[in-house]
């Protein structure tokens, strides 16, 4: 994986599409059944993941120290399943009712301390501007000029985040972009404020109770380690989907929405147990 993106790269080729093609033209070619929501499937997924998360916390509580890593992996991966459900809610594909999407989305993101509306709005921006250099907010790479203008320390951190410490990428993204509601305008600002206060107050109360009951060891055991596993998957999924060497990021004047949506994302397959959870 390349650590720095040159300003102009011809290493990747977009699908052969007409210059004036619109994303809507492509969407219109899809069969109607792909847009039909399946409520039974959606709620079954919620039930399965809730059960898995409960089992995960139980496993963490009862496991001897040498089995805790397995329990953390199971719980953290199940919490990633919560985020997948919230992802569908953010795209309004979980339910036909917006309030149901928002309610379920907030419930699913509360345990991982993720402000739902902030993520939803920023994620929609990412899809609207997929792989548009300097505009997309997911794994947007430095240009060669930007990288060379950075201090050696920042260059070192940039390479590490794009290398061995990729699994921390989503933590930096989460902390930097999702808690400042003043960056949003109008109705969106109020929505983000609500989501931020919900996770800060709710998460603060819940994990304060864990700390007061079990101490710092309990906080590490029940929150930090599963949370890090969750972010391992979050970082891995998003990085693999958008940062393969052959995936181009384009300057705005060169960028085409349809091409970006078709060639800017890689579909990845994971082990069956990851797909299930």
Regions found by a protein language model. Give the residues of each.
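Short acidic-hydrophobic sequence patches enriched in Asp/Glu that either
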Residues: 95-103, 115-118, 228, 254
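Juxtamembrane/interface helices at transmembrane-helix boundaries
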Residues: 69, 213-225, 229-241, 246-248
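Membrane-interfacial segments at transmembrane helix termini in multi-pass membrane proteins
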Residues: 231, 235-273
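Residue-level signal for short amphipathic helical patches enriched in basic/charged
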Residues: 80, 114, 231
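Non-catalytic, topology-defining segments of multipass membrane proteins
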Residues: 1-77, 85, 102, 109-225
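Acidic, Ser/Thr-rich low-complexity segments on the non-lumenal side of membrane proteins
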Residues: 116-125, 263-277
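Select transmembrane alpha-helical segments in multipass membrane proteins
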Residues: 100-106, 274-277
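Acidic (Asp/Glu-rich) catalytic motifs at the cytosolic membrane interface
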Residues: 79-99, 119-131, 237, 241-244, ...
């Amino acid at each position: 994986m390349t650590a720095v993106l040159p300003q102009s790269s011809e290493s990747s080729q977009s699908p052969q599409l007409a210059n004036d093609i619109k994303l809507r033209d492509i969407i219109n070619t899809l069969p109607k059944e792909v847009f039909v929501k399946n409520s039974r499937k959606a709620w079954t997924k919620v039930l399965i993941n809730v059960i898995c998360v409960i089992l995960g916390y139980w496993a963490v509580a009862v496991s001897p120290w040498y089995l805790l890593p397995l329990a953390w992996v199971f719980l953290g991966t199940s919490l990633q399943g919560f985020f997948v459900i919230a992802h569908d809610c953010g795209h309004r594909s979980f339910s036909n009712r917006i309030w149901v999407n928002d309610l379920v989305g907030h419930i699913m993101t509360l345990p991982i301390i993720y402000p739902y509306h902030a993520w939803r709005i920023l994620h929609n921006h990412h899809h609207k501007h997929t792989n548009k250099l300097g505009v997309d907010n997911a794994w947007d790479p430095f240009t060669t000029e930007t990288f060379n203008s950075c201090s050696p320390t920042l260059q070192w951190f940039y390479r590490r985040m794009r290398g061995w410490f990729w699994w921390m990428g989503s933590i930096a993204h989460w902390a930097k972009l999702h808690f400042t509601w003043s960056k949003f305008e109008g109705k969106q600002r109020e929505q983000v404020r609500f989501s931020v206060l919900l996770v800060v107050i709710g998460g603060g109360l819940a994990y304060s109770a864990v700390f007061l009951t079990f101490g710092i060891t309990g906080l590490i055991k029940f929150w930090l380690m599963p949370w890090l596993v969750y972010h391992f998957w979050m970082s891995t999924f998003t990085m693999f989907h958008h940062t393969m060497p052959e995936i181009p990021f384009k300057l705005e004047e060169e960028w085409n929405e349809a091409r970006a949506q078709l060639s800017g994302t890689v579909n990845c397959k994971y082990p069956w147990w990851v797909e299930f959870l």
